[in-house]
Amino acid sequence: VTNHCLICDRIKLIQENKNPYFVRELSTGYVVLGDSQYFEGYTLFLSKHHVTELHQLAPAEKLAFLEEMSLVQEACAKAFHADKMNIELLGNGDAHVHWHLFPRHNGDTAQPGPVWWTPMDVMFGDDVIKDMPRLNRLKAALGAALDEVLKVRATDDGVKKLNQGD
């Protein structure tokens, strides 16, 4: 772990309105599309707090972060019509808690398996990274799906409160 954090740098760009991959701010983190869209809809959910492990978050924040990640995952699945979602919390390269969310489709790799079996030069090719019209279309799709998921969540919470007599 070094004093320099690439995720913190990305968050700073979001706060300065300079991150073209930014989709939405939630209470515990930031939703961004991945630099590479080889797996269309590849999304990250970045913790607002710089911790290197999930268990280092305060208990209430940890639960909220996990719940919001689940909502982002649901929106990502809806927006990109995923057959299956792959979700990972790694941090070996960037030691700042963040989720990788990959919408997967039948036949999207030569053999069924993790996205990391795809050669890095293919997965992170320049032609994939710099396609801004495509990126903007994907951001709009994910933003609309987040609106839908968050609206349902707010309605569900309201129903729960009514049922509890609050």
PLM region spans:
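HIT superfamily nucleotide-processing domains
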Residues: V1-D166
